[in-house]
Regions:
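Contiguous, well-ordered alpha-helical segments that form the cores/surfaces of helical PPI scaffolds
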Residues: 14-18, 34, 52
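Short alpha-helical segments that sit at the start of domains
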Residues: 1-25
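Acidic, glycine-rich loop-and-strand cores that form catalytic or ligand-binding grooves
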Residues: 88-89
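Short acidic, hydrophobic short linear motifs in intrinsically disordered regions
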Residues: 25-36
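Accessory beta->alpha helical hairpin/"wing" motif in late/C-terminal subdomains of nucleic-acid enzymes
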Residues: 63-82
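Exposed, interaction-prone assembly regions rather than primary DNA-binding/catalytic cores
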Residues: 92-164
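A short, conserved structural fragment
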Residues: 55-65
Length: 164
């Protein structure tokens, strides 16, 4: 394990709760790991053990689709213990969480979906939403799956090109 500001498993648990309390949506296992491994003092095996312990003690729970979400108990303990985290770790975590939340907001606002039709063609649905309502929805018929997937992916990457 590298030298870092996180010194023990209790601090890893505090960090996991700190992160879970600040994200805007439940986290997939890989996302939780990416956000937690922000300090050289954390190794994967300690992280995995701490994450499992937090689920067992009902500070976190797993959703039906395998994502982690903080419970009321976890939120309460996170608020009590967050000042125990080293300041530099909190700063780095806040930066990473802000970037994650920004990307999550974009995923919620820019959506695309491909469905196969009965005749073998595909419908690509492209939608833009804001916090309140749907701004735009466009459905396009395309001949093959590759074209449909490409169109959906390009819209996800640069929706402003279509909307402008």
């Amino acid at each position: 394990m590298g030298i870092g500001f996180i010194q023990d498993k209790l601090e890893i648990k505090f960090l996991i709760l700190y992160i879970a309390a600040r994200v805007t949506e439940p986290l997939a296992p890989a996302e939780m790991q990416d956000l937690t491994m922000c300090d050289d003092g954390i190794d994967y095996f300690d992280y995995a053990e701490c994450l499992n312990d937090l689920v067992k003690t009902e500070h976190l729970r797993l959703t039906e689709d395998g994502r982690y979400v903080i419970t009321e108990k976890g939120l309460k303990n996170s608020q009590i213990c967050e000042s125990s985290l080293p300041y530099s770790v909190r700063q780095r975590s806040d930066k990473n969480i802000a970037a994650y939340n920004k990307e999550a907001l974009r995923r919620a606002q820019v959506q695309s979906h491909v469905t196969e039709r009965d005749n073998g063609t595909y419908t690509v649905t492209l939608a833009l939403r804001d916090d309140v309502d749907e701004l735009m929805e466009l459905r396009l018929m395309v001949a093959d799956r590759a074209t449909a997937d490409g169109l959906a992916q390009r819209f996800q990457q640069e929706p402003e090109k279509l909307y402008a």
